Amino acid sequence: MSEPQGQELRAECPVCWNPFNNTFHTPKVLDCCHSFCVECLAHLSLVTPARRRLLCPLCRQPTVLASGQPVTDLPTDTAMLTLLRLEPHHVILEGHQLCLKDQPKSRYFLRQPRVYTLDLGAEPGSQTGLPQDTAPDTRPVPIPSHYSLRECVRNPHFRIFAYLMAVILSVTLLLIFSIFWTKQFFWGMG
């Protein structure tokens, strides 16, 4: 009985206790063979004074990163993903954000890929409020162009919705017509 509970514990990041997945909690392996989620390692790499060296949160063994190598390039714990029946996604670290680009499953859909980002917080030593010389970003919302409306029509979810609405409207009109026709037919005969 304690064995399945041990597997559950191993399927979680030992730092944040979130279950591993194939997005921002992808298990990454350090040189000491301990696995942590990429979000915790990214936080750790951003607050560590020596950015090229990560100390394992459990055993304190250092993992040396190559010059310019982000923590997202550490090896993924594929055994853990196999145990969870997940396929790995490529997560990248850009500045203080983790980015995940969701690739469409089929090349037949003309949907743009979605990009998910996770903000890891402000830089160490920066102020929490807005600086006085910068105003908040107030860009106007762009009006949808003809091209974006055309892309909306190509969206398979929109097409299914439009077909369903057309079928529902047709069936409703057919029912209304048949009810009035039968009333007129039976009352006209009598």
Curated annotation (Swiss-Prot):
A Pfam family (short name) is zf-RING_2
Q: What class of enzyme is it?
A: transferase
The entry lists its GO molecular-function terms as: ubiquitin protein ligase activity; zinc ion binding
The record's account of tissue expression is:
Highly expressed in the kidney and testis.
Query: Which UniProt key words apply to this protein?
Result: Apoptosis, Endoplasmic reticulum, Golgi apparatus, Lysosome, Membrane, Metal-binding, Transferase, Transmembrane, Transmembrane helix, Ubl conjugation, Ubl conjugation pathway, Zinc, Zinc-finger
Q: What is the lineage of its organism?
A: Eukaryota, Metazoa, Chordata, Craniata, Vertebrata
Q: Can you say what this protein is called?
A: E3 ubiquitin-protein ligase RNF183
Tell me the gene name. Answer: Rnf183
Instruction: Output the PANTHER family linked to this UniProt entry.
Output: E3 UBIQUITIN-PROTEIN LIGASE RNF183 (PTHR22791:SF7), RING-TYPE DOMAIN-CONTAINING PROTEIN (PTHR22791)
